[in-house]
């Protein structure tokens, strides 16, 4: 029995989940603090891959990153490699389709965070960075981990956009 396909799927899903984890936390944290109108627009844009069929997402990525397209030509010129039909394109496609799950879950966790805890930290003289890592992240840990698990499962099961 050949185990390479399973290993390859796990490898792509793991790398994609690491990228999604940090970018999803970053996007969710900063978008949760924006005004409602801007938050709504960005929310629609970032969660669009959830409602599009995977083959449509794959087609759009091919059209965007193909070597004859401006972005694909830039990547070809700058890095002397094409991105389409490579191992990296599978990672990029899984990041695109699984990112909304991490983003929405983490954003929900950040929006449900009790701001009085952050205010209490500020009154004690803590910096925003310290409050983020020592107060906000531990309080939002369950939502963030749930988003990471959902993103990993989506990345592991992704076939449409990567085929």
Give names to the regions the model predicted:
Residues 1-111, 135-163:
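Membrane-water interface segments at the C-terminal ends of transmembrane alpha-helices
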Residues 107-118, 128:
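Membrane-helix/interface signature in polytopic inner-membrane proteins
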Residues 124-126, 138:
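Glycine/proline-centered hinge or cleavage motifs at structural transition points of membrane proteins
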Residues 121:
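The alpha-helix within a helix-turn-helix
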């Amino acid at each position: 029995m050949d185990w390479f396909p399973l290993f390859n799927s796990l490898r792509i899903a793991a790398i994609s989940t690491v990228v999604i984890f940090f970018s999803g936390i970053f996007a969710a944290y900063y978008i949760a603090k924006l005004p409602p109108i801007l938050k709504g627009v960005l929310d629609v844009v970032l969660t669009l891959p959830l409602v599009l069929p995977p083959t449509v997402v794959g087609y759009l990525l091919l059209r965007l990153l193909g070597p004859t397209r401006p972005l694909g030509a830039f990547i070809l010129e700058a890095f002397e490699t094409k991105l389409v039909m490579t191992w990296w394109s599978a990672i990029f496609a899984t990041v695109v389709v699984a990112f909304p799950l991490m983003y929405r879950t983490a954003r929900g966790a950040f929006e449900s965070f009790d701001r009085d805890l952050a205010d209490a930290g500020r009154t004690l003289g803590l910096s925003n960075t310290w409050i983020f890592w020592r107060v906000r992240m531990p309080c939002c840990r369950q939502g963030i981990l749930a988003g990471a698990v959902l993103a990993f499962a989506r990345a592991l099961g992704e076939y449409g956009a990567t085929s």
